[in-house]
């Protein structure tokens, strides 16, 4: 994976979390507890954007913008292959993630609950539709490296849409 600029995580901001393919972590069924989390092509949707709620030194709860639900471990699992899903904030350690920066500017997301296992993809795939799981660290494992990027263009895009919309025509009132 090539080097990328390191993103500083700040409160009250939203971010995408992208695999080496550019596909991002997204909530597929984000409005319900147990909602699926998969990779998808970034379409500027709130289901694909996340905030990081600081819990301690490099430890965060990762909250989905659309639903407010947290990235969590299915059944509070700790084994390799435990899937990730969304769940309401229950204050549990299975919802806490250590953000570990690499020299290349990527990060590993490590479960605070599952002995530091890394967010990974099922089947070593980072294509659209890949399901997320935890797995022990695999040296050189590109599927465990993520790029966190701040979402900056949402306001700019909205302003462009407003500017592009034709102004309403004003007609003079008919003479009486």
Can you annotate each of these PLM segments?
Residues 1-176:
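Lectin-like carbohydrate-binding module/patch detector with strong preference for beta-trefoil
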């Amino acid at each position: 994976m090539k080097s990328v600029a390191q993103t500083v995580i700040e409160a009250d901001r939203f971010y995408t979390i992208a695999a080496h393919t550019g596909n991002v972590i997204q909530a597929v069924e984000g409005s319900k507890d147990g909602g699926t989390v998969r990779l998808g092509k970034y379409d500027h949707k709130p289901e694909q954007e996340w905030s990081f709620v600081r819990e301690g030194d490099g430890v965060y709860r990762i909250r989905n913008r659309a639903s407010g639900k947290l990235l969590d471990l299915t059944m509070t699992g700790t084994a390799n292959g435990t899937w990730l899903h969304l769940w309401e904030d229950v204050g549990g350690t299975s919802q806490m993630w250590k953000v570990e920066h690499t020299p290349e500017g990527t990060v590993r997301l490590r479960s605070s609950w599952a002995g530091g296992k890394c967010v990974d993809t099922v089947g070593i795939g980072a294509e659209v539709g890949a399901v997320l799981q935890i797995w022990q660290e695999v040296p050189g494992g590109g599927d465990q490296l993520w790029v966190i990027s701040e979402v900056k263009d949402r306001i700019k895009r909205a302003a462009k849409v407003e500017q592009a919309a034709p102004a309403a025509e004003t007609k003079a009132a008919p003479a009486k």
